[in-house]
């Protein structure tokens, strides 16, 4: 992916911050965790890792920091545990700052 809109992805975190109090007040903590691990940790970081934007790494770091704050113990999160094994592997790698390895695995999988 060769676009340079990495910083625009930070809007996702603003939306998540607006969504969080509503979901927690309604007793939907697990649903919020689902959004964090799927949309922030998996989709957004994986998409950003493919970009060539100069600020890509700092934006990925912001997403990873957000995931750490909202889901401090990833492997104990019920939403994480409910995911398929391959998705959990990519989430785990993204959570721990190994998004390049995650992208390598995904690219190899595409070619097989």
Regions found by a protein language model. Name each.
Residues 53-112:
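Membrane-interface aromatic/basic loop that binds lipid-linked glycans or pyrophosphate carriers
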Residues 24-33, 74-80:
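Flexible helix-coil transition and linker loops at the boundaries of alpha-helical arrays
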Residues 5-9, 29-34:
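Amphipathic, non-membrane alpha-helical segments in soluble helical-bundle scaffolds
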Residues 1-15, 48-58:
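Nucleotide-sugar-dependent glycosyltransferase catalytic core
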Residues 12-22, 63-70:
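Amphipathic alpha-helices of TPR/Sel1-like and other helical repeat/solenoid scaffolds
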Residues 18-28, 46-49:
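Short helix-capping and hinge/turn segments at secondary-structure transitions, especially at repeat
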Residues 31-36, 57, 61:
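Short, charged, amphipathic alpha-helical segments
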Residues 34-47:
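Amphipathic alpha-helical repeat scaffolds of TPR domains
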């Amino acid at each position: 992916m060769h676009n340079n809109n990495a910083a625009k992805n930070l809007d996702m975190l603003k939306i998540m911050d607006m969504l969080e109090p509503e979901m927690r007040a309604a007793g939907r903590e697990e649903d919020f965790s689902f959004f964090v691990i799927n949309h922030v940790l998996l989709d957004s970081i994986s998409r950003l890792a493919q970009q060539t934007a100069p600020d890509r790494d700092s934006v990925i770091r912001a997403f990873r920091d957000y995931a750490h704050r909202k889901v401090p113990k990833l492997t104990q999160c019920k939403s994480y545990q409910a995911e398929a094994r391959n998705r959990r592997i990519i989430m785990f790698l993204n959570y721990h700052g190994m998004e390049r390895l995650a992208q390598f695995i995904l690219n190899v999988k595409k070619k097989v």
